[in-house]
C-alpha cells in the first residue's frame, strides 16, 4: 500500500490512475501518516453513478471535429491554422517554457505563486519516463502554449496546461487540446484522458472550458481525507468559519474537507 502513495505539499496522494485507487481503512491511512505528511487524500469508486461532491474531469470518447459545436469547430480550425502542434522534447520546453508559464500564472484571477526558474527546470529534468511534452508554436517558431502530461498504460493525465495570454484570442488552447485528444484517444486508443480532480482553488477556468467545448465530463467518485490528530482538530475548529478566513491555502483545505462523501 505504501509504495502506491507519495507526499505532495504535505499530503499523501495516489500515484497511479484514479480508476485503480481503492478505499483505505483508517489503519492504512495512519500507517502512511506515521511516515510523515499531514493528511491522506483517498478517492475511490471512480466514475460511480452517484453525483458526489468530488470528481475527476475526463474524456473517454473522441468523435473528431464532428462531435464539436459549429462554433468550436471553427475555433479549432483557426487554432490549427495559426499554430503548429506537436510533441516536443524536454530540451525544447526548458528553452522556452518558463516565459510562457510566468505569463500564464500572472493572468490568473487568484494570486498564484509562480515557481522559480530553478524549480521549473528541476521538475522537467527529474520527470518520470512516462512524462510527455507538447507545444504550440506560432509562425515564428516561438512557443505559445505547452502541456506536460503523464501517459500511463491506458490513460493520460493532462497535468499542466499553460498558454501565453496574448495567444488565447488566436485559439491556441483549442488547437493544442484537440490534437492531444485526437492523439491519445484515437491514435493511441487509451481509455481516457483527464485534467485532474475537481479544482479546489478555481484559479483558472480550464475545467469548465474542457467540459463546455470538448465534451469532457465529470467522473464522480468518493473522497475521504485522513488527518493527523492536530490538523483534524484545527479543521474541526475552523470549518464553521470557513467563509471568513482570508488565507487562500486554508480556504482550499477547508473547501476540500467539505467535498467528502
Per-region residue spans from a language model:
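Acidic-and-aromatic substrate-binding clefts and catalytic sites of carbohydrate-active enzymes
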Residues: 20-23, 93, 197-203
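Well-ordered, non-membrane alpha-helical segments in soluble/globular domains
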Residues: 22-29, 117-119, 173-179
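Active-site/acyl-donor-binding loops of N-acyltransferases
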Residues: 1-5, 45-65, 187-261
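Aromatic (often tryptophan-rich) hydrophobic motifs at membrane interfaces
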Residues: 130-233
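N-terminal accessory interaction module
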Residues: 1-45
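A conserved beta-strand-loop-helix scaffold within acyl/acetyltransferase catalytic domains
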Residues: 1-8, 42-49, 61-169, 184
